[in-house]
Amino acid sequence: MLHLEDDNGRQRSVIANLQKFVYCCLYLRFIKDGSLFLILLGWIISSLCDFIQELTLRYLKKNYLEVGRDNDQEDDESLAIRGLETPIVRMIINKAIRYYQGLILLETAYCIVYHIRLDVSRDICSKPYGFVIMLLIREFTCPVPTAFPSKLLLVLLDILLLFCQIVIINGSLSSSLQNVKLIVKELNAEEEGALNILKLNTWHMDATGPELIVLKNHDKSIPQQADGDDATEITPLLNIAE
C-alpha cells in the first residue's frame, strides 16, 4: 500500500510543478508580447484544471474512502462534501471539458492572430519592461536585427504552454487517492493520447456526462464502474459483474 500512496503523491506533485511551470511560461510570454488577454486566458485555464482536480479528489474521498468513519465526523463534514454524487460529478466534468475545449481554442486562435500581427519594433521596443526585468532569456533587442527570429521564442512558449495545459487537464481528470484511481472512460488517453480530450464531443454525449471508472488497487486493478448510485465491480479476467 505504501508504494501506491507514494505514486499518488508523486502524480499530484508532478501536476503541481507543471502548474508552476505554466505560470512561469505565462509570465515570460507576457514579458515578450505584452498581451494581458493571453495571460488572463492562461490563468483561467489553469484555474479550471485546479477546480477539476479538486473535484475529482473530493469525489473519490467522499464516495470510496469513507468506509469506517464514525457518524459524528461524517455529520460534521456532510455540508462540505454534499453534491458529490456520481450523476452530478459527471455533468460537472462534462461541462468543464466543454469549457476547457472552448478556452483552448480561443487561446490558440488569439495567439496565432496576435503574434502574426505583432510588430516587435513598434509594440515591444517602446515598452521598457521587456528589457530591464528579464535579461537571461535572450530578450528582444532594439532595433530588431533582420536576421534574428524575434518571434521564435513566442512560438516555442505557445507550443510549450499548450502541451503543459493538455497534460495537466488529463492528469486532473485521472486523479488518484490512496488505493483508488478515477478514469474518464471516453477520454481513453492511454490508447488515444492526451490530445484526445480536444476531439471529445461533449455536445453529443449522454446527458448525464462521461462515464467514470474507478480502479481499486489491491493485488490487481479491479475496475469499478461509477455509473450510478451503486457502482458495480467487474472482474477483468471473467468480464462479468459480481
Curated annotation (Swiss-Prot):
One of its GO terms (cellular component) is fungal-type vacuole. It is found in: Vacuole membrane. It is a multi-pass membrane protein. The chain crosses the membrane at residues 128-148, 152-172. Coiled coil: none annotated. Keywords: Membrane, Transmembrane, Transmembrane helix, Vacuole. It comes from the Eukaryota. Component of the vacuole-localized DSC E3 ubiquitin ligase complex involved in the targeting of the complex to the vacuole membrane via the AP3 pathway to ubiquinate vacuolar membrane proteins. Competes with GLD1 to determine the subcellular localizations of the DSC complex. Part of the vacuole-localized DSC E3 ligase complex composed of at least TUL1, DSC2, DSC3, UBX3, CDC48 and VLD1. This is Vacuole localized DSC protein 1. It comes from Saccharomyces cerevisiae (strain ATCC 204508 / S288c) (Baker's yeast). The gene is VLD1.
